[in-house]
């Protein structure tokens, strides 16, 4: 049946980081669509080895480790391994969402707190309810991550530390691939999974995207922050109810089915 492949005949531009884009591509193709991959950003470690002793001391203290992304989890455990550090069993763990929690589980780490809505504001609210006075809250983050948790919790008397584990940089190879793809395909959907991909895309092909939208291309944002980033360039987008890749896919399927009914 046609409904078994709601993205049949649709071309989806995936601007996600290369390491994380494969599953997105597979899901688009399983729904009958064609996915074109252009990795616009990549990541590199930012926390130097010469602070390993301070990290060891922070890990030994009672309190929370807060993971706001899969990248944060990956770079954290890579750092521990390289510096022969161990995550103490007494540490409480908070994760921003399901994917981050699943990645932590791969490292045999269970999550104590996870908000129902996968954004930093909701994670901060959850920590307010579960953290106790005297506990240090240490946030694993990237250089472009917001400091919502610190802003929300410090005024309440919590000690909040931030470890900048990784930094986001443009993927020059992916940017060239984007330029090539723009000349080869017409896109039904352009997907954005972070504000940084929005800014990189708009720097490279901002005017082209406006033309694509005028011709019927729809932009799909993973969540409100990414949506807001597009709005700063005058670009409107559609955002799923659930701020995940699966939510984006469900939204595109729904839009495609609605288009068929018109």
Swiss-Prot record:
> Which InterPro entries does the record match to this protein?
4pyrrol_syn_uPrphyn_synt_sf, 4pyrrol_synth_uPrphyn_synth, UROS/Hem4
EC number(s) reported in the record: 4.2.1.75
Q: Give the EC class as a word.
A: lyase
Classification via SUPFAM superfamilies: HemD-like (SSF69618)
Tell me yes or no: is Acetylation among this UniProt entry's keywords: no
Taken from the record, one Pfam family name reads: HEM4
GO terms for biological process? protoporphyrinogen IX biosynthetic process; uroporphyrinogen III biosynthetic process
**MF terms (GO), sorted A to Z:** uroporphyrinogen-III synthase activity
Provide the reaction this enzyme catalyses: hydroxymethylbilane = uroporphyrinogen III + H2O
Q: What keywords are annotated for this sequence in UniProt?
A: Lyase, Porphyrin biosynthesis
Tell me the pathway. Answer: Porphyrin-containing compound metabolism; protoporphyrin-IX biosynthesis; coproporphyrinogen-III from 5-aminolevulinate: step 3/4
Role according to the record: Catalyzes cyclization of the linear tetrapyrrole, hydroxymethylbilane, to the macrocyclic uroporphyrinogen III.
| Complex and partners | Monomer.
Family per similarity comment: Belongs to the uroporphyrinogen-III synthase family.
> What PANTHER family does UniProt report for this protein, alphabetically?
UROPORPHYRINOGEN-III SYNTHASE, CHLOROPLASTIC
Please report the name of this protein according to its UniProt entry.
Uroporphyrinogen-III synthase
| Species whose genome carries this gene | Bacillus subtilis (strain 168)
Which lineage?
Bacteria, Bacillati, Bacillota, Bacilli, Bacillales
